[in-house]
Amino acid sequence: MKTFVAKPHEVKRDWFVIDAKGKVLGRVASEVAHRLRGKHKPEFTPHVDTGDYIVIINAADIVVTGNKAQDKKYFRHTTYPGGIRETNFEKMQQRFPGRAIQKAVKGMLPKGPLGYAMIKKLKVYAGAEHPHTAQQPKPLEF
């Protein structure tokens, strides 16, 4: 008996939609990363992108527990000397509602070309509307 190895052109991908309204950031991010990677499928292969497409709606209404809204820091750099900038979760949500969930999921995916391909299958929208109705995404509850 041989171990099954998925081939990139034979992978069947589904579309799922997740309503993030009132859900905790880390719990949503870990489930999304799991599904983007394809670990929920029996044909999972570590070196092949076997994951599904995920659409997250209501990203502006995602929550964090405790004092993380003020205490959690996000860093970026302007590429100029001394150009490090920091912002907290609250300000990030006001300015870019989908970026916090995107950064959380990206940190949970593999680094390198395979991880970059996986994060492209994540679509995040601040409101309840999304342009992917033609793909008929199935609602995902957890």
From Swiss-Prot:
Disulfide bonds: none annotated. It comes from the Bacteria. The keyword Acetylation does not apply. Pfam families: Ribosomal_L13. InterPro entries: Ribosomal_uL13 (IPR005822), Ribosomal_uL13_bac-type (IPR005823), Ribosomal_uL13_sf (IPR036899). Keywords: Ribonucleoprotein, Ribosomal protein. The keyword Ribosomal protein applies. One of its GO terms (biological process) is translation. GO terms for molecular function: mRNA binding; structural constituent of ribosome. One of its GO terms (cellular component) is cytosolic large ribosomal subunit. PANTHER family: LARGE RIBOSOMAL SUBUNIT PROTEIN UL13M, RIBOSOMAL PROTEIN L13. NCBIfam families: rplM_bact (TIGR01066). Belongs to the universal ribosomal protein uL13 family. This protein is one of the early assembly proteins of the 50S ribosomal subunit, although it is not seen to bind rRNA by itself. It is important during the early stages of 50S assembly. Part of the 50S ribosomal subunit. This is Large ribosomal subunit protein uL13.
